[in-house]
């Protein structure tokens, strides 16, 4: 992996109806209905809104057999109206419902935490190695039964692990760890590989973006060790709504997309499902438009470990670096910034105010001014660019800020 230059990870291709995923295909975007799956017309109308917004896939939950069976009516009505976007059934707890859905829709998502294992009860279970192997045999037998149906009906499968619903069996052996999350997925993946079933998509989701990122990276490494390159679905659970939901999704999904990881995404917001699509599109375009950028000749930090998120050690400058909490710098020149309206803990650590008079701004935060107008005074610091870099030796300040773009440093 190149840590400095964007390259999308090369995955295998998964066939999902008329819209294949992975390989050289674009990053696909999807959303999920929040209507009752037993009610055909509301599901159809909402699905159409999602599709018209630009979704490549529409996912619907199927809690029971009746809901799974009604997917046929929903699909039929969508086709009648000229919509042939692949549908995905979301299944929990009941493998029999997954069997039913696999005969109808183009893709079925199952949760390894409750597909065969009982629902999580937070009870610690003790297994000998032989007993644990027997549990894997049960899982394998039932999963193969499901895969045979998928093969017959050309149905794709997403193995979708949720951090919050790992089985008691996995939790008892691996604990609440990224390693346990990954193993929950790998148990099913190994069966897919043995059975030569390749229309598979994987996902690891968590409401904690740090856990999500680390677990997905670990999954990629584990797959590479075992000769697998299945495509990835990215998403953050319980992202929320408004600005918070968008920021959380950008942190979790965006970080992995920047790594080149991800073949389909869903931005999960507590809003109308169709509102998720433009957010997802903007996020994907922001990352993928950087493909083919001017090469960056970076040097990897010697102690950097892709699978361990440890903060880089740095020198302390004022209240920045070392063990200090990362500081925030806000641009007071932006049109939508209301300095007077910001109160209390919402204040940034620093305001950038350009060439303006620092005394015209509240002293509740430090102020950063352009170096060519800097005058020494408490809580005010200079900012240097390539044009003003020559002033660095002559200006005395406890902290000096430098602003350069990568091409300017090369």
Which residues does each PLM region occupy?
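N-terminal amphipathic alpha-helix/helix-capping segment at the start of soluble metabolic enzymes
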Residues: 1-32, 147, 151-153, 289-338
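Hydrophobic faces of well-ordered beta-strands that scaffold small-molecule active sites
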Residues: 27-33, 58-60, 85-91, 108-110, ...
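Glycine-rich, proline-tolerant flexible connector loops at the mouths of alpha/beta enzymes
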Residues: 34, 54-78, 112-134, 200-209, ...
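N-terminal active-site wall of soluble small-molecule enzyme domains
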Residues: 62-104, 335-340, 356-362, 371-377, ...
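Alpha-helix-loop-beta-strand connector modules within alpha/beta enzyme cores
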Residues: 65-89, 137-154, 219-228, 289, ...
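Hydrophobic or amphipathic alpha-helical targeting/insertion segments
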Residues: 84-123, 129-149, 154
């Amino acid at each position: 992996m190149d840590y400095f230059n964007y390259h999308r990870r090369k995955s295998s291709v998964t066939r999902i109806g008329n819209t294949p995923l992975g390989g050289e295909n674009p990053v696909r975007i999807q959303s999920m209905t929040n209507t009752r799956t037993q009610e055909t017309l509301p599901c159809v109308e909402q699905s159409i809104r999602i599709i018209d917004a630009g979704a490549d896939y529409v996912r619907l939950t199927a809690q029971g057999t009746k809901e799974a069976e009604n997917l046929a009516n929903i699909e039929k009505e969508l086709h009648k109206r000229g919509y042939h976007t692949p549908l995905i059934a979301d299944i929990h707890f009941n493998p029999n419902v997954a069997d039913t859905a696999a005969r109808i829709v183009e893709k079925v998502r199952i949760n390894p935490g409750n597909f065969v294992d009982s629902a999580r009860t937070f009870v610690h279970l003790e297994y000998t190695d032989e007993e644990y192997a027997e549990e894997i045999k049960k899982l394998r037998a039932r999963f193969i039964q499901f895969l045979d149906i998928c093969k017959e009906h050309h149905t794709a499968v997403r193995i979708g692990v949720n951090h919050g619903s790992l089985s008691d069996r996995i939790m008892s052996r691996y604990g609440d760890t990224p390693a346990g999350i990954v193993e929950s997925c790998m148990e099913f993946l190994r069966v897919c590989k043995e059975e030569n079933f390749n229309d598979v998509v994987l996902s690891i989701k968590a409401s904690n973006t740090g856990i999500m990122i680390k677990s997905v990276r670990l999954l990629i490494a584990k797959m590479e060790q075992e000769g697998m390159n299945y495509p990835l679905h990215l998403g953050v659970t319980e992202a929320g709504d408004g600005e918070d939901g968008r920021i959380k999704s950008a942190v979790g999904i965006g970080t992995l997309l920047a790594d080149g990881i991800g073949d389909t995404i869903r931005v999960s917001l507590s809003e109308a499902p169709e509102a998720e699509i433009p957010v997802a599109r903007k996020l994907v375009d922001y990352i993928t438009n950087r493909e083919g950028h001017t090469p960056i000749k970076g040097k990897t930090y010697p102690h950097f470990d892709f699978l361990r998120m440890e903060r880089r050690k740095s020198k302390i400058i004022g209240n920045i670096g070392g063990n200090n909490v990362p500081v925030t710098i806000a641009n007071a020149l932006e049109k939508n910034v209301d300095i007077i309206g910001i109160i209390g803990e919402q204040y940034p650590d620093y305001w950038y105010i350009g060439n303006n008079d620092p005394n015209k701004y509240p002293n509740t935060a430090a102020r950063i001014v352009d170096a060519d107008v800097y005058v020494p005074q408490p809580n005010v610091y200079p900012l240097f660019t390539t044009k003003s870099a020559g002033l660095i030796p002559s200006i005395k300040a406890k902290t000096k800020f430098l602003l350069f773009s990568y091409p300017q440093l090369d």
